[in-house]
Amino acid sequence: TEHSSTIIGVQHLAEGYIGCNVKMQGSIVSEHFIVEDDTLLGNCSLQHCYVGEGCRLDGGFSAHDSLIFANSNLSNGEASAAFLGPYTVSMHRSTLLIGGAFSFFNAGSGTNQSNHQYRLGPIHHGLMERGVKCSSDSYMLWPARVGAFSKLVGRFYRHPDTAEFPFAVLTSDGGEMQIQPAVTIGHIGTWRDFEKWPLRDNRTSTLPDDRLVFRLWQPAIMYRVWQGWKQLDRKSTRLNSSHSGE
């Protein structure tokens, strides 16, 4: 029927819920799971996971104890204790998303994080705000917070909090971090993403579970822009004062 789901050749399913118009095919192992409408699963492993509407999971992707929301596209790689908001994209084998919250996120090859500092155990977490992109082999040691639509390049060990600087490019070789505010706002990739997200909505329901707001200029983001501008203005004033006193 129009709203039926299809299950073909899966390996193991136990204690789960499968919504309407779901297709599950291939080497799938899943226990204690919820899979919502319009989702495609192929060759993946899920343990204690929620998968929202319109998601695509395949290529040997594995996840446990994670929430995966609408229109996420996950192939290869893995997620552990992760909150993967709408349009989270991870397409590479060596990618690990762990102990953090992500949304409208793009993980480059080899992107990973650590949510423990060995002696203390896995007690830390972090936040990549909407639209963050990670370059290949980027690494973040939690706790940390990255502002919306920023780009990470390198390895970050000093727990940055750049929430007040959206649209920034952050670079680090493991030591001090360099931040270039308001750079990605002019990148063609940012505007391309903004335009393509509504076109890649796989949900067919007229009343989908997730209410997605695609607007780029949202009040929360503009408030961060305002806070960042004030912080830079204060720093500029102090620098000018120190130079004038010399």
Language-model segments: residues:
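Single conserved hydrophobic/aromatic residue that forms the stacking wall/gate
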Residues: L239-E246
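Glycine-rich hexapeptide-repeat left-handed beta-helix
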Residues: T1, M24-E31, E36-D233
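Long, structured ligand/cofactor-binding scaffold of large enzymes
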Residues: G9-V10
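Glycine-rich beta-solenoid repeat tracts in large extracellular/virion proteins
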Residues: S5-T6, K23, L40, E246
